[in-house]
Amino acid sequence: MLRGIFHICLLASFLLLPFSSAVHDSGFTGGTDAPPPWDHNVSPPPETAPSPTPTSSPSTTSPPSPGPVAAPSPINNGSVSGDMTWWCNKTPHAETCNYYFRKSSQNNINLRPPRFRSEFLRMLVKVALDQAVITHSQTVKFGPSCTNNQRKAAWSDCVNLFQNTVAQLNRTLKGLNPAASSDVKCTDFDAQTWLSTAQTNIETCRSGSEDLNVSDFVMPVISNKNLSDLIGNCLAVNGVLMKQHDHTTTANHKEYFPSWVSRHERRLLVSASLAKSSPHLVVAQDRSGHFRSIQAAINFAARRRFKSRFVIYVKKGVYRENIDVGNDNHNIMLVGDGERKTIITSGRSVQHGYTTYNSATGGFGGQRFVAKDMTFINTAGPLRGQAVAVRSSSDLSVFYRVGIHGFQDTLYIHSQRQFFRECYISGTIDFIFGNAAVVFQNCMILVRRPLHGQANIITAQGRGDPFQNTGITIHSSRIIAASDLKPVIRAYKTYLGRPWQAYSRVTIMKTYIDNSISPLGWSPWLRGSNFALNTVFYGEYKNFGPGSSTRWRVRWKGFHAITSTAVASRFTVGSLIAGGSWLPATGVPFKSGL
């Protein structure tokens, strides 16, 4: 009974967040390598960064060199200057590369040395795919050894994550085939995204086992860095190929729709009223729809034969359930009656025995997922640690006019390409975290009151490889204290971010920053730690408001007070997520450039 009262009170506290400070009333307008760092000559005031509760410990292995590793030049005359060893020695993980190609040779597999980088890349992806299949199979075999719920939870995540790694590598290999059909063929930007996801899945398996203190259980699999190194080699070689092309997209979203989007689907995506009037399914608690449960509707959609856009209209109400859109359930669109009317809520957390990954109120995996006009809440509360409201690993996904509320680890932007427009996001510690390539545009980011002795950290970006084309951009948005923090704003430190992984990348541009943010701006992972301070990329460009001054910001090599339009443009919708090529199909407004 007490738990029920607590749940209702906590839900009410989320709904009392300052929705009235609407983004559109705030005077808003409307994968790249990190640029060379530069130093700042102004000393910050004497202030010690706090020791906030970490989401996960940083990797204890030595990170690879942050500088680009040159892949071999293409050999146009058809000959090679050596054998596979010559090619492998050009990669960042040469020993691993040589080992697996020697192994193939010993197994009587005839390997002809490649003539071009692109051929070598396909060979690398094939080797990584073969190893991923083996790793997945080994992980599945751990199932009978799951003697408690914690092990079962970590094992289940790892099985699904390695299965997805196999899928991402297989998708990449097919897409890189010169003979692939147009609907399968991929760009090198696509490939870099999928390879980044494949590698991120491995790290997520590891961190999930640490969440529940069962890392010894899956250690035989996750301690083997070979698969991660093989994918890292793919990222490095494909990264060189990416530099030969410009993936910035500037298409006018009012004029462009991809050819695969039908005329009806275009109208459906652009018009919220049309989506409500002619959905494929309706969810309603008053029995006026097809289902009373959102998950039941999602499960029904997963069984459909054709994977075109499928609209589920969720009528107003509070839905107490966890929902999950599987990795193979593509083109799902959830449309509600508004942020304050359609509410999905649950209270899973790590302290309840869930991994961070699986604690999400809403988890989304299928490609091109869209959510509009609804709110997701994790009601676990500040005492329960990591508790996710939304987790997205959906490629080309969009969240439009969506509320996402919690405390620690509110929004898990896990992987792939994502876009958030006019969303409200609230939390305390690391409440926007993960390793997607993601842009937040015209969003309201609300910093809540943490527990006594804690500090607020807005972002914890998880880029663990210098060639991953991932990062967080907050553009034309507002970063402000929520109503529960405002009266005690001076009692708590708040930072824009801290480095979850060695190459963490966050850029904040043309955004209002209030006085809740510490003058230092950014925090180390732990108090006194030097982890990743020279290899991160934390950039600020033309922000405004009382907390926006970069005069007293940290003096790390990885911090950049950006003054160049060319540098800032690398982190826009058009560049970081190549949004001009896919966002028009969603019907959601966006600004491609600065």
Swiss-Prot record:
Catalyzed reactions per annotation: [(1->4)-alpha-D-galacturonosyl methyl ester](n) + n H2O = [(1->4)-alpha-D-galacturonosyl](n) + n methanol + n H(+)
Residue numbers spanned by region Pectinesterase inhibitor 33: 78-237
Entry's Gene Ontology molecular function annotations: enzyme inhibitor activity; pectinesterase activity
Residues covered by region (Pectinesterase 33): 280-581
Site positions (Transition state stabilizer): Q408
Catalytic residues in the record: D409 (proton donor), D430 (nucleophile)
Pathway(s) this gene product operates in, as recorded in its UniProt entry: Glycan metabolism; pectin degradation; 2-dehydro-3-deoxy-D-gluconate from pectin: step 1/5
Extent of the signal sequence: 1-22
Residues binding substrate: T356, Q386, R498, W500
Stated family: In the N-terminal section; belongs to the PMEI family.
Protein name: Probable pectinesterase/pectinesterase inhibitor 33
Gene this chain is encoded by: PME33
